[in-house]
A protein has these predicted regions:
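Flavin-dependent oxidoreductases
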Residues: 44, 165-220
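Short glycine-/acidic-enriched loop or helix-start segments at secondary-structure transitions
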Residues: 23, 84-85, 189-191
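Glycine-rich FAD pyrophosphate-binding loop
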Residues: 5-25
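Glycine-rich nucleotide phosphate-binding loop and flanking beta-alpha elements
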Residues: 81, 152, 185-187
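Dinucleotide-binding Rossmann-like beta1-alpha1 core, especially the glycine-rich loop
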Residues: 28-109
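Hydrophobic anchor at the start of a short beta-strand
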Residues: 11, 98, 178
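Helical element adjacent to the flavin cofactor pocket in flavoenzyme catalytic cores
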Residues: 119-173, 177, 181
C-alpha cells in the first residue's frame, strides 16, 4: 500500500480487524535475513528485501519512535545452526552484511557474557512492528478501513468489486486493481478456492527482564 501511495496511487486498505494485529502486532521484531547456506533465488530475494526494508525503515520511522539500529547477533544455539552460519560466513561477497564471531567477540558486541559463537548483522535492527505498520499506513494517499471483513471479490466489466462486512453492515467497494494480503485467511474467498494455502503457526514468548537484559547493546 505504501509503495503504491508513494507513486501517487490512491489506495484503500480493508483490514479485517484493527491494523497491526496478528503477526504484525508482535511487541518486538528483528530485522535481518534468515537465508540458506547456499545461493538460491529465495536467498537473493531475502537479501534484496533486507536491504530495502532497512532503507525504508530509516526513511519512514524516526529511530526514537519504535526501532533501534543496534545490530542483530544470531547465535549458534545448536550444531546445525553453527554449520549453516559457518558456511554463510565463507561467502565473501556478503561479508559487509554479516560476519562470523566467536563467543568472546559475541560477548563484546552484546555487552553481556555469551557462551555461543554466531553471526553478526551490523546493519540489523530491533523494531516495534505496530509502530512501523501504522507509520506506513499514515500516508495521505492511503485510506484505512478497519474491521472490514472481505467476503467476496469479483470482476465486473472493467473493475473489481469487493463485498465486505463492517460492524454487521454489508458494503461494496469498486477498485481498478486488487492486492490480496490476507495470508492463509484468503482461502475463504471464492476467488481463491482450491489454491494450495498452507497455514504455518508462529509463536512468540515474553519473559521478565533481568540485570543482564538491561545491559544488552544489541539484539539477540
Amino acid at each position: 500500500a505504501y509503495a503504491l501511495a508513494q507513486r501517487g496511487v490512491a489506495v484503500t486498505v480493508l483490514e479485517a480487524g484493527k491494523a497491526a494485529q496478528a503477526a504484525s502486532g508482535n511487541r518486538q521484531g528483528l530485522l535481518y535475513a534468515k537465508i540458506a547456506a547456499h545461493p538460491t533465488a529465495q536467498t537473493k530475494l531475502l537479501l534484496a528485501g533486507y536491504g530495502y526494508s532497512r532503507q525504508l525503515l530509516d526513511l519512514t520511522l524516526p529511530e526514537s519512535h519504535g526501532w533501534h539500529a543496534c545490530g542483530v547477533l544470531h547465535l549458534n544455539h545448536n550444531a546445525s545452526e553453527e554449520r549453516r552460519n559457518q558456511q554463510l560466513a565463507q561467502q565473501h561477497p556478503h561479508s559487509t552484511l554479516y560476519q562470523a564471531v566467536n563467543a568472546a567477540e559475541a560477548s563484546a558486541l552484546a555487552g553481556v557474557p555469551i557462551s555461543h559463537s554466531g553471526l553478526w548483522w551490523p546493519h540489523g535492527a530491533w523494531l516495534h512492528p505496530p509502530a512501523w505498520v501504522n507509520a506506513l499506513l499514515a500516508h495521505p494517499h492511503i485510506r484505512l478501513v478497519e474491521y472490514a471483513r472481505v467476503e467476496d471479490v469479483e470482476r465486473h466489466h472493467n473493475h473489481w468489486q469487493l463485498s465486505y462486512r463492517q460492524h454487521g453492515h454489508a458494503h461494496i467497494l469498486a477498485a481498478s486493481h486488487v492486492v490480496l494480503c490476507g495470508g492463509a485467511a484468503s482461502a475463504h474467498l471464492p476467488l481463491l478456492h482450491g489454491w494450495p494455502f498452507q497455514p504455518i503457526r508462529g509463536q512468540t514468548s515474553t519473559a521478565r527482564t533481568g540485570v543482564l537484559a538491561q545491559q544488552l547493546r544489541c539484539a539477540l
